[in-house]
Amino acid sequence: MTKSPQTLSLWKEKKKSKSSGKMNTFLRRVLRCVKAASHMYSMMDRQPQTVSHISAMLFYAFELYCDFTGGIDITIGIAEVMGIRVTENFNLPYFSKNIKEYWNRWHITMGTWFTDYIFYPISVCKPMLNLSKFSRKHFGEVIGKRVTVYLSAFVVWFTTGLWHGAAWNFIVWGLMNFVVIMVSQELEPLYEKFHKRFSVKGKVPYEAFQILRTFLLMSCIRMFDCYRDVPLTFKMVGTMFTKFNIGELFNGSLLSIGLSVADYVVLIVGFIVVFTVSLFKVRVGNVRTVLLQKPPIVYFGIMAVMIMLIIVFGAYGIGYDSSQFIYNQF
């Protein structure tokens, strides 16, 4: 037994199970309520449902990851059945320590294409080289180097936004990625000084903080991808920080969105499973490789459990469109 594309296919189905459908229901209902709620906030003496917004932000991040990586896993599995090797497109992006690393792990082929066919050609075109020469002469070597890089990166991220959709929310999403990456690069010397001063680089608690910070920052930026009303999205993000109310966790607000306690249990269990497998890959190695080294009875036993989980928790039946991947849009 040297390879098993069926494992990838089953893991994809597990990712696209009932938890993903529940998250989609939650997100649709939150976004449907947001616009009406934004008008009510100015007229009613109460705080907005910030916990619902935060939950939607986190669920959307989880749903996208399951949808995108699940679609790629099934594609890789089917391709291997036919003897074709397909490039891995997602490499544990939510374990990234900064946004630059995140984009080296998320939608890898897209990033490579934009780099090879937009960033580099623009960087070395004659007008850009002339601009670089002019900037070095009049503003110094440091600024001269940055001008071409930043302008090329601006075009890349603007185009990336348009590629996701011809709407302002996607453009804002792309440019926010651009701004954060550029600011991070400018602050890199300060980061290095901080790391040397406090000797935290490489320490597990600090790396966990970096991963959590990157995940939350990307989740906030991704809200512009989720909802088309840009001003309202800014307002949603703002209220999450300025009007957070921990009491919403206990007053039944989350249950009023459309999910029951049992639904939330499914979501949490699904998250734990995906997180555990991802952490296993970080600490031990590829799960698939490890499984193939086990005795056949263990391997097929795990496969049987996965099939049963799909049968019990899977979203299927009348009215369910199994081909309705978010990833199909991109």
Regions found by a protein language model. Give the residues of each.
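Membrane-embedded transmembrane alpha-helical bundles that form the catalytic cores
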Residues: 1-278, 282-329
